[in-house]
Amino acid sequence: MSLLTEVETPTRNEWECRCSGSSDPLVVASSIIGILHLILWILDRLFFKCIYRRLKYGLKRGPSTEGVPESMREEYRQEQQSAVDVDDGHFVNIELE
């Protein structure tokens, strides 16, 4: 007997699951694993950007500035900002008609 043919059987009123009242440990374990898998899949799809960004970059927030004079901190911030500033000369402007 295959589990696939025994799970759902038609009755007069509606479809019923024969395993719903079963106390078989294998059925209980597979049900729990199935529910956990579904919950984890839903959470993964909802929060995949946050989760994978955390895995990729960790909790790093940049280098520590403890013990560094304020003038050097400001210089570092300006260097970082200038590194991210966009130079328009590197891009081609395309106008759509």
UniProtKB/Swiss-Prot annotation:
The keyword Disulfide bond applies. The record marks H37 as: Essential for channel activity, possibly by being protonated during channel activation, and by forming the channel gate and the selective filter. Belongs to the influenza viruses matrix protein M2 family. The modification Phosphoserine is found at S64, S82. One of its GO terms (cellular component) is virion membrane. Cytoplasmic tail plays an important role in virion assembly and morphogenesis. A lipid is attached at C50 (S-palmitoyl cysteine). This is Matrix protein 2. One of its GO terms (biological process) is symbiont genome entry into host cell via pore formation in plasma membrane. Residues 1-22 are virion surface. Keywords: Disulfide bond, Host cell membrane, Host membrane, Host-virus interaction, Hydrogen ion transport, Inhibition of host autophagy by virus, Ion channel, Ion transport, Lipoprotein, Membrane, Palmitate, Phosphoprotein, Signal-anchor, Transmembrane, Transmembrane helix, Transport, Viral ion channel, Virion. When the channel is activated, one or more imidazole moieties of His-37 probably become bi-protonated. HAMAP family: INFV_M2 (MF_04069). Pfam families: Flu_M2 (PF00599). The chain crosses the membrane at residues 23-43. The record marks W41 as: Seems to be involved in pH gating. Forms a proton-selective ion channel that is necessary for the efficient release of the viral genome during virus entry. After attaching to the cell surface, the virion enters the cell by endocytosis. Acidification of the endosome triggers M2 ion channel activity. Residues 60-83 are annotated as: Disordered. InterPro entries: Flu_M2.
